[in-house]
UniProtKB/Swiss-Prot annotation:
Active site: 69, 118
An annotated Gene Ontology molecular function: zinc ion binding
Enzyme Commission number(s) of this protein: 3.5.1.130, 3.5.1.132
Cofactor annotation comment: Binds 2 Zn(2+) or Co(2+) ions per subunit.
Entry keywords, A to Z: Amino-acid biosynthesis, Arginine biosynthesis, Cobalt, Cytoplasm, Hydrolase, Lysine biosynthesis, Metal-binding, Zinc
PROSITE patterns: ARGE_DAPE_CPG2_1
Protein name, per record: Putative [LysW]-lysine/[LysW]-ornithine hydrolase
Gene name of the encoded protein: lysK
Pathway where this protein functions: Amino-acid biosynthesis; L-lysine biosynthesis via AAA pathway; L-lysine from L-alpha-aminoadipate (Thermus route): step 5/5; Amino-acid biosynthesis; L-arginine biosynthesis
Keyword Hydrolase: yes
Reported function: Catalyzes the release of L-lysine from [LysW]-gamma-L-lysine and the release of L-ornithine from [LysW]-L-ornithine.
Binding site for Zn(2+) 1: 67, 91, 140
Reaction it catalyzes: [amino-group carrier protein]-C-terminal-gamma-(L-lysyl)-L-glutamate + H2O = [amino-group carrier protein]-C-terminal-L-glutamate + L-lysine; [amino-group carrier protein]-C-terminal-gamma-(L-ornithyl)-L-glutamate + H2O = [amino-group carrier protein]-C-terminal-L-glutamate + L-ornithine
Length: 337
């Protein structure tokens, strides 16, 4: 089935017009479900609100997973030339829409998942109940010629200090102890994918009748192999994930991008995505791919090139065609790095 380009653009614009911050994804999920059914894809909404589409076809089962929710902050939706403005255009309704149309226009064996709560605690990815796929492709902005092969982990920790009250002339209380703790942690920060980084998410300190009380919540972006201290009060921890660049899935993306006249770029990102959850959970290789500049994520300037959006659909269709019914390990066994 071939879908006209203007229909693909219309769908993306209408999806972006549905404001769907985390926790309010229901309308957008229903919109996607109706469109999938219109294209002849079996679709349903699961118990946590994920919208699932199932298209039986040829070759190994491939999971195409994006997220329906966005961060808060409405941006008026408009098209100016080649550019679509709006919250979620890049992160990640553009990539999600590209996955949808690649599935519809191919005859690969695909499960499509529009997940909820990715910008929260990934409730949708954790609760996803589908058959084990052979490969996972996550819809996140990588740029039309980019493939994301790694994301750092995300660790959210709470620190609490209680200090018996004393006269202010003596010295520091709970707040000062928390500051010392933060300086100790941040002193180990390093740039790059293999370094630890982070920020303070919440900091409160006040006096009670007989004590100084302080609470600090921090979010750390963790490198591969990082293990937090066991005595920390961990709210949530999603370890880093990195796929082998020699994986058949990665090589298929590289070849597909080259065949469309572009120079492929492999990327490792300091953020965290549902790929970190889905790949280890299913025990399969995963990459993230999609149109858009991730530097615009969460900003008031979020916008996407419609030409890049349409090109990314072609890349994904090429990938699905190559993955379909081939022994990729044999094809790439003797290929150069």
């Amino acid at each position: 089935m071939e879908i006209p380009k203007d229909e693909k653009i219309k769908f993306l614009k209408e999806l972006v017009e549905i404001y769907s911050p985390t926790g309010k994804e229901e309308e957008a999920a229903k919109f996607i479900k109706e469109k999938l059914e219109e294209y002849g894809v079996k679709a349903y909404i699961d118990k946590v609100g994920n919208v699932i589409g199932v298209k039986e076809g040829e070759g190994p089962l491939i999971l195409l997973a994006g997220h329906v929710d966005t961060v808060p902050g409405y941006i008026p939706v408009r098209i100016e030339g080649d550019i679509l403005w709006g919250r979620g255009s890049v992160d990640a309704k553009g990539p999600l829409s590209a996955l949808l149309f690649a599935m519809v226009e191919s005859n690969a064996n695909v499960i499509f998942a529009g997940l909820v709560d990715e910008e929260g605690f990934s409730k949708g990815a954790r609760a996803l109940d589908v058959p084990r796929p052979e490969y996972v492709i996550v819809g996140e902005p990588s740029g039309v010629n980019g493939v994301t092969i790694g994301y750092k982990g995300s660790l959210t920790v709470r620190f609490v200090e209680r200090v018996e009250k004393f006269h202010g002339s003596i010295g520091g209380g709970a707040a000062e102890k928390l500051i010392e703790r933060w300086l100790s942690i941040s002193g180990n920060f390093e740039d790059g994918f293999n370094g630890l980084s982070g920020r303070i998410v919440r900091f409160v300190a006040y006096e009670r009748d007989f004590e100084f009380y302080g609470e600090m919540i921090v979010n750390l972006r963790t490198p591969p192999g990082y293990e937090p201290p066991r005595d920390w009060d961990i709210i949530d921890f999603v370890p880093a994930y990195e796929v082998n660049r020699r994986s058949p899935l990665v090589r298929t993306f590289v070849r597909s991008i080259r065949e469309l006249g572009m120079k492929p770029k492999l990327k490792k990102k300091s953020g965290t995505a549902d790929m970190n959850i889905l790949a280890p959970r299913f025990g399969v290789d995963a990459v993230a791919y999609g149109p858009g500049d991730s530097r615009l994520d969460h900003t008031p300037y979020e916008r996407i090139s419609l030409m890049e959006y349409l090109q990314s659909i072609d890349v994904l269709k090429n990938v699905l065609t190559k993955l379909k019914g081939k022994d990729l390990d044999k094809i790439y066994k003797s290929s150069p790095r």
